[in-house]
Protein backbone atom coordinates (compact mmCIF):
# COMPACT_ATOMS: atom_id res chain seq x y z
CA UNK A 1 0.00 0.00 0.00
CA UNK A 2 1.45 3.37 -1.06
CA UNK A 3 0.94 5.99 1.62
CA UNK A 4 1.50 9.69 1.14
CA UNK A 5 1.47 12.48 3.68
CA UNK A 6 0.22 15.96 2.79
CA UNK A 7 1.19 18.27 5.66
CA UNK A 8 0.03 21.82 6.21
CA UNK A 9 -1.40 24.35 8.60
CA UNK A 10 -4.59 24.67 6.50
CA UNK A 11 -5.50 27.98 8.18
CA UNK A 12 -7.92 27.89 6.42
CA UNK A 13 -8.04 25.08 3.88
CA UNK A 14 -8.35 26.61 0.39
CA UNK A 15 -9.44 25.45 -3.03
CA UNK A 16 -5.73 25.19 -3.86
CA UNK A 17 -5.25 22.69 -1.03
CA UNK A 18 -8.30 20.76 -2.23
CA UNK A 19 -6.86 20.60 -5.76
CA UNK A 20 -3.58 19.14 -4.48
CA UNK A 21 -5.47 16.63 -2.31
CA UNK A 22 -7.65 15.45 -5.21
CA UNK A 23 -4.64 14.97 -7.44
CA UNK A 24 -2.50 13.35 -4.74
CA UNK A 25 -5.15 10.69 -4.14
CA UNK A 26 -4.48 9.38 -7.64
CA UNK A 27 -0.81 8.80 -6.73
CA UNK A 28 -1.33 6.84 -3.51
CA UNK A 29 -3.59 4.23 -1.97
CA UNK A 30 -3.78 6.15 1.30
CA UNK A 31 -3.35 9.89 1.84
CA UNK A 32 -2.79 11.19 5.35
CA UNK A 33 -3.50 14.89 5.66
CA UNK A 34 -1.42 16.16 8.55
CA UNK A 35 -2.71 19.34 10.18
CA UNK A 36 0.11 20.96 12.11
CA UNK A 37 1.28 24.11 13.82
CA UNK A 38 3.93 26.39 12.42
CA UNK A 39 5.77 28.55 14.95
CA UNK A 40 6.35 31.23 12.30
CA UNK A 41 2.62 31.65 11.58
CA UNK A 42 -0.17 33.26 13.60
CA UNK A 43 -3.19 31.00 13.10
CA UNK A 44 -6.73 32.31 12.88
CA UNK A 45 -8.07 28.90 13.94
CA UNK A 46 -6.86 26.44 16.58
CA UNK A 47 -5.44 23.08 15.52
CA UNK A 48 -8.69 21.44 16.64
CA UNK A 49 -10.77 23.85 14.56
CA UNK A 50 -8.56 23.37 11.50
CA UNK A 51 -8.69 19.60 11.93
CA UNK A 52 -12.50 19.71 12.03
CA UNK A 53 -12.57 22.05 9.01
CA UNK A 54 -10.36 19.74 6.94
CA UNK A 55 -12.32 16.65 8.01
CA UNK A 56 -15.57 18.33 6.97
CA UNK A 57 -14.14 19.32 3.58
CA UNK A 58 -12.80 15.80 3.00
CA UNK A 59 -16.22 14.31 3.76
CA UNK A 60 -17.63 16.45 0.93
CA UNK A 61 -14.84 15.89 -1.59
CA UNK A 62 -15.46 13.80 -4.68
CA UNK A 63 -13.29 12.46 -7.50
CA UNK A 64 -10.56 11.11 -5.22
CA UNK A 65 -10.33 7.74 -6.85
CA UNK A 66 -10.17 4.82 -4.46
CA UNK A 67 -7.61 6.30 -2.08
CA UNK A 68 -8.33 6.23 1.63
CA UNK A 69 -8.10 9.73 3.11
CA UNK A 70 -7.24 10.21 6.75
CA UNK A 71 -7.01 13.57 8.54
CA UNK A 72 -4.90 13.83 11.69
CA UNK A 73 -3.04 16.50 13.62
CA UNK A 74 0.64 16.26 14.45
CA UNK A 75 3.17 18.26 16.39
CA UNK A 76 6.54 16.77 15.51
CA UNK A 77 9.13 16.74 12.78
CA UNK A 78 7.45 16.00 9.46
CA UNK A 79 9.71 13.04 8.77
CA UNK A 80 8.96 11.50 12.17
CA UNK A 81 5.24 11.89 11.43
CA UNK A 82 5.67 10.40 7.94
CA UNK A 83 7.56 7.41 9.37
CA UNK A 84 4.84 6.80 11.97
CA UNK A 85 2.24 6.83 9.18
CA UNK A 86 4.27 4.41 7.04
CA UNK A 87 4.52 6.97 4.24
CA UNK A 88 6.72 6.52 1.20
CA UNK A 89 6.16 10.08 0.01
CA UNK A 90 5.53 13.62 1.17
CA UNK A 91 3.19 15.59 -1.09
CA UNK A 92 3.80 19.32 -1.45
CA UNK A 93 1.99 21.85 -3.58
CA UNK A 94 3.81 24.54 -5.53
CA UNK A 95 2.34 27.84 -6.69
CA UNK A 96 5.37 29.85 -7.78
CA UNK A 97 9.16 29.93 -7.96
CA UNK A 98 9.31 31.31 -4.40
CA UNK A 99 7.48 28.18 -3.18
CA UNK A 100 9.94 25.98 -5.04
CA UNK A 101 13.01 27.56 -3.43
CA UNK A 102 11.65 27.00 0.08
CA UNK A 103 10.23 23.54 -0.67
CA UNK A 104 13.44 22.43 -2.42
CA UNK A 105 15.45 23.33 0.69
CA UNK A 106 12.96 21.53 2.96
CA UNK A 107 12.96 18.44 0.72
CA UNK A 108 16.75 18.35 0.88
CA UNK A 109 16.75 18.58 4.67
CA UNK A 110 14.03 15.93 4.91
CA UNK A 111 16.04 13.63 2.63
CA UNK A 112 18.96 13.96 5.03
CA UNK A 113 16.67 12.82 7.84
CA UNK A 114 15.20 9.88 5.90
CA UNK A 115 16.26 9.12 2.34
CA UNK A 116 13.59 6.43 1.93
CA UNK A 117 10.73 8.95 1.88
CA UNK A 118 10.47 10.95 -1.35
CA UNK A 119 9.07 14.45 -1.68
CA UNK A 120 6.67 14.81 -4.61
CA UNK A 121 5.81 18.29 -5.86
CA UNK A 122 2.46 19.00 -7.52
CA UNK A 123 1.92 22.29 -9.31
CA UNK A 124 -1.26 24.07 -8.33
CA UNK A 125 -3.77 24.46 -11.12
CA UNK A 126 -3.22 27.71 -13.04
CA UNK A 127 -6.38 29.38 -11.75
CA UNK A 128 -5.48 28.37 -8.18
CA UNK A 129 -1.84 29.47 -8.14
CA UNK A 130 -2.42 32.88 -6.51
CA UNK A 131 -4.37 31.39 -3.59
CA UNK A 132 -2.65 31.38 -0.21
CA UNK A 133 -4.28 30.95 3.20
CA UNK A 134 -2.45 34.04 4.44
CA UNK A 135 -3.97 36.16 1.66
CA UNK A 136 -7.43 34.66 2.17
CA UNK A 137 -7.30 35.72 5.83
CA UNK A 138 -6.04 39.19 4.95
CA UNK A 139 -8.78 39.73 2.36
CA UNK A 140 -11.43 38.54 4.84
CA UNK A 141 -10.08 40.79 7.60
CA UNK A 142 -10.56 43.79 5.31
CA UNK A 143 -14.08 42.71 4.36
CA UNK A 144 -13.23 41.41 0.89
CA UNK A 145 -14.87 38.55 -0.98
CA UNK A 146 -13.07 35.22 -0.40
CA UNK A 147 -15.68 33.05 -2.12
CA UNK A 148 -13.41 32.41 -5.12
CA UNK A 149 -10.68 30.95 -2.91
CA UNK A 150 -12.47 28.67 -0.41
CA UNK A 151 -15.62 26.56 -0.22
CA UNK A 152 -18.85 28.12 1.06
CA UNK A 153 -18.50 26.29 4.38
CA UNK A 154 -14.95 27.57 4.91
CA UNK A 155 -16.04 31.07 3.92
CA UNK A 156 -18.71 30.89 6.63
CA UNK A 157 -16.09 29.77 9.18
CA UNK A 158 -13.73 32.59 8.24
CA UNK A 159 -16.49 35.23 8.25
CA UNK A 160 -17.63 34.06 11.70
CA UNK A 161 -14.07 34.30 13.03
CA UNK A 162 -13.60 37.77 11.52
CA UNK A 163 -16.85 38.84 13.22
CA UNK A 164 -15.36 37.70 16.55
CA UNK A 165 -11.93 39.29 16.18
CA UNK A 166 -13.04 42.38 14.26
CA UNK A 167 -12.43 43.66 10.77
CA UNK A 168 -9.46 45.80 9.89
CA UNK A 169 -9.95 49.17 8.26
CA UNK A 170 -13.56 49.40 9.42
Question: Which residues fall in each region the model found?
Answer:
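Nucleotidyltransferase catalytic core that binds NTPs
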Residues: 1-170
Amino acid sequence: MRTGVYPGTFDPITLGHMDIIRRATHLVDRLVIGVTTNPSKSPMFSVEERLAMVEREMAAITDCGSAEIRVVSFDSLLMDFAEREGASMIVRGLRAVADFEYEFQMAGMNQQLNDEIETVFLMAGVSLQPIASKLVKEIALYGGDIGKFVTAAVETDVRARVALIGRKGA
